[in-house]
């Protein structure tokens, strides 16, 4: 009896020691995966395009507790810059943390600045950015749809962006075409920011709102970045804004606006594009007018294809880059929904993340004419995922990975090169980057003229007055064009669902 009691005590002590060790290890692992943020430590720090890119930047950061907002700038020699003007927004609470925003202006063009953000109780490490020098030669990177939920998948998305910076080290800003997260929660935004912290610390971000960036709570996207909202038609679930860089004019659309893009936003875009004489006109947006992705079968995609492209045609837009469908597709130049060398090229920019979608071949020649396709790459193994110019083929093995796009502008030449960072089977595997597409556009410079000089703001009254016509326009497209196309496509769709489990 006594021996059995001693054995029982020994076993219980061993179990206690094992459980204690497990708790310590588990705690340590938890801390390594989710570091504890100090009460006044700045986090989720971003520097964004905000207004005049030669002289101005937007700053946004968070703290756990309320504290003052301070941005400090330094030159390349480490001396504090005192001649910049800094305008701070009121600090406000959001989802359990406090949001700090500032706009820094009176900067010098073509200058590298270093900065810290924070307050009296906590200051960030130094970051850096460069202002536009106004010259006609510059480079930038574009990615889309990191859209992760786990720290592991955010890390993989961040590696894709780093591969972009390694491939194009002279990139002056990074465009994120939306869906930063999957469910837009505190935990996911923290994981995103934690994994791209080193990237955001040395560049300017051009963010675009994705449909996943405000799920459940609309204001998430707008509270993550300091953006120029002076002409935005609404500021709840995304922002539309524009800026110049070099000899290019960029407009950012918000496809979370009513039916993807409201009539008010279409009007804003046309006025905006007609108010510039820059050589290149480029539009960034999340959803795409031309796609073979899973959402290409719904009325809002056709609505974009019919309503938005008319504005782009009239304004002479050269390039549209989008995300949303987690695959890469480039169209030939299109105008009036036909191939035209003077038209607009549409780029569905692939996914930088790990969620990758098959194409839907049943959409072909119903919602996207296959003759329009210049390049198509799907980053996922599966049936019929590559378009070779005349037929669907199996996915190429080299295309299995995250996608990033490097764009350079040099006067009258714009070059886009798209790359895949191959997935690794093991951490020790070498990094393999493969170029899978290239676009070169050329034009004569100095040809664009300013034709609009008026006020391009939209009052709340004007916006809501346009809601009914926007829905009527969708109804016309839905019942007049989408529904007949859908029923004609239906047998192929059902075959895809039954035989390939692809909807």
Locations of regions flagged by a protein language model:
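Active-site glycine-centered loops adjacent to acidic/histidine catalytic or metal-binding residues
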Residues: 145, 178-179, 210-211, 286, ...
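Metal-dependent phosphoesterase/phosphodiesterase active-site architecture
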Residues: 29-70, 76-81, 89-91, 96-99, ...
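Sec-dependent N-terminal signal peptides of Gram-positive bacterial secreted proteins and lipoproteins
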Residues: 4-26
């Amino acid at each position: 009896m006594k021996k059995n009691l001693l054995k029982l005590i020994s076993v219980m002590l061993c179990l206690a020691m094992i459980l204690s060790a497990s708790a310590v290890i588990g705690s340590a692992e938890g801390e390594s995966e989710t570091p504890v943020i100090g009460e006044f430590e700045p986090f989720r720090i971003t520097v964004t395009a905000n207004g005049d890119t030669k002289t101005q930047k937007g700053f946004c950061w968070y703290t756990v507790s309320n504290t003052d907002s301070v941005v400090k700038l330094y030159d390349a020699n480490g001396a504090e810059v005192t001649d910049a003007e800094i305008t701070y927004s009121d600090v406000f609470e959001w989802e359990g943390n406090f949001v700090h925003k500032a706009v820094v202006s009176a900067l010098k063009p073509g200058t590298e600045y270093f900065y810290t953000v924070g307050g009296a109780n906590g200051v960030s490490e130094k970051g850096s950015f460069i202002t536009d020098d106004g010259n006609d030669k510059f480079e930038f990177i574009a990615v889309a749809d990191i859209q992760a939920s786990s720290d592991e998948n955010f890390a993989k998305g961040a590696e894709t962006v780093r591969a972009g910076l390694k491939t194009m080290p002279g990139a002056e800003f990074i465009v994120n075409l939306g869906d930063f997260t999957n469910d837009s929660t505190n935990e996911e935004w923290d994981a995103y920011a934690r994994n791209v912290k080193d990237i955001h610390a040395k560049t300017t971000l051009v963010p675009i709102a994705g449909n996943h960036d405000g799920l459940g709570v609309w204001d998430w996207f707008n509270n993550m970045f300091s953006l120029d909202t002076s002409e935005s038609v609404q500021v709840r679930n995304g922002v539309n804004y524009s800026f110049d860089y070099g000899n290019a004019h960029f407009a950012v659309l918000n496809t979370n606006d009513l039916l993807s893009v409201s009539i008010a936003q279409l009007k804003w875009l046309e006025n905006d594009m007609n108010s510039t004489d820059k050589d290149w006109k480029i539009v960034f947006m999340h959803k795409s007018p031309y796609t073979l992705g899973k959402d290409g079968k719904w009325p809002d995609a056709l609505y974009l294809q019919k309503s938005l492209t008319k504005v782009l045609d009239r304004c002479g837009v050269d390039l549209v880059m989008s995300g949303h469908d987690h695959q890469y597709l480039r169209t030939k130049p299109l105008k009036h929904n036909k191939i035209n060398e003077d038209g607009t090229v549409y780029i569905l920019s692939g996914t930088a993340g790990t969620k990758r979608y098959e194409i839907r071949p049943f959409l072909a020649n119903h919602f996207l004419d296959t003759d329009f396709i210049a390049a198509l790459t799907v980053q996922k193994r599966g049936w019929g995922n590559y378009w070779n110019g005349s037929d669907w083929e199996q996915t190429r093995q080299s295309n299995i990975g995250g996608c990033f796009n490097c764009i350079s502008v040099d006067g009258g030449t714009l070059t886009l090169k798209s790359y895949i960072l191959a997935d690794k089977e093991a951490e020790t595997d070498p990094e393999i980057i493969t170029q899978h597409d290239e676009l070169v556009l050329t034009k004569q410079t100095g040809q664009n003229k300013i034709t609009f000089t008026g006020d391009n703001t939209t009052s709340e009254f004007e916006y809501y007055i346009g809601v009914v016509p926007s829905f009527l326009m969708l109804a016309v497209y839905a019942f007049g064009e989408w529904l007949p196309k859908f029923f004609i496509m239906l047998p192929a769709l059902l075959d895809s669902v039954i035989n390939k489990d692809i909807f």
